[in-house]
Amino acid sequence: GLDGNKGDYDKFYHNVNGQMIRHREIHNLYGMNMTRSAFEALQEICPEKRTLFFSRSSYIGAHRYGGIWQGDNRSWWSHILQSMQQLPALNMAGFLFVGSDTGGFGSDTTEDLMLRWLQYALFTPLFRNHSADGTREQELYRFDNVQAAAEMIKIRYALLPYLYSEFL
């Protein structure tokens, strides 16, 4: 059976044009093709509208169809640093619409970590606060320093015309 480990990728195959291919050889292509298919379908259905897609599983070239979200992270200082380090690498790979879960997804964020993450994330194209069930509710109004968060959100709103023109 499948155990959820890397060895499982050797145990199942996909039929690609009549050829059986191991999943591990096309794993990231799956995410890219899902994004591409959705993008192309919406272009056909409503070509006059701009669309926005982002995925956490992707492949080189997928930047033509959407952005990339850096995946489930933790509410840890090391993960905000990791996000900052990944961003330029993703940019060099062609992914310009990039971002992480502001404040962290898993674990309980602190007010200080959330404010620092906001300061960083307000300059990233993908900007969202998203957390796992069972973690601290991390909507900005739940923290004491709502005014500091509000000031950062004002900066983000001021950047929206630029971000829209560059990324959408």
Identify what each model region corresponds to.
Residues G1-L168:
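Catalytic-domain carbohydrate-binding cleft regions of carbohydrate-active enzymes
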